[in-house]
Amino acid sequence: MPIHENVGGLIRLAKRRNGILLALIAMCVMTLSVSLRAKSNDQVPYPMGYRMWTHVRTVLIGPQSPAFESFGGLHHIYANGKAMEGYRAGRFPDGSVLVFELLETRENAGVTTEGPRKRVGVMVKESKRYAETGGWGFESFQGDSQTERRLNPEGRIACFKCHEPQKDNDYVFSKLRK
C-alpha cells in the first residue's frame, strides 16, 4: 500500500476522533450548563408587576404580636390569577404566586400610614420542583431590590416550617375575605 493512502487513512481517523472528541466536549458543556441552570432554577424569581395583581388583604402586625420582631409592620398580600383560583378552591394549582409586601409603619396624630418597604416575600407553587416544601418555593427580597435575596436554603426550609401548621390550607396563612 502506498504511503499516501496510509496518511489519508490516518487523517480520516484523526478527523473522526476529533469529531468524537468535540461531540464529547459539547455534551459535557451542555450537561454542566443544564446542571447549573437547574440549581439557579430552584430560586424563586422576583414577581414583576405584582402590585397589579389582586390585592387579597392587608394585615398590621403590631408590637404586641410575638411575630413583631421578624414581621412587624404593614403587610399587603397579592395573588396572581392562578393563586386566586386556589383561594376559591382551597388548593393552589401549580403556577400560583403569592406576594406579601412588608412595609414599615408611620404614626402621626393617630393615623397609621405606610413607611419604607422592608421586604417582598414570595411563594411560588410548583409541586414537583418544590416537593420537599409542600410544593411551595419561598424567597424574600430586601427592601426595594429586585435582586437582593434574603434567604439561603436553610431560610427557605424555615419559611416552610413556619407555614407547615397551615397544611390544611395548602400551607397558606391568608384567606379571602367573605
What are these regions (language model features)?
Residues 33-35:
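N-terminal signal peptide c-region/cleavage motif recognized by signal peptidases
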Residues 39-68, 85, 89-178:
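Sequence context surrounding c-type heme c attachment/ligation sites in exported
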Residues 72-83:
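Short, structured beta-strand/loop micro-motifs enriched in basic residues and often containing a Trp
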Residues 1-16:
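N-terminal secretory signal peptides that target proteins for export/translocation
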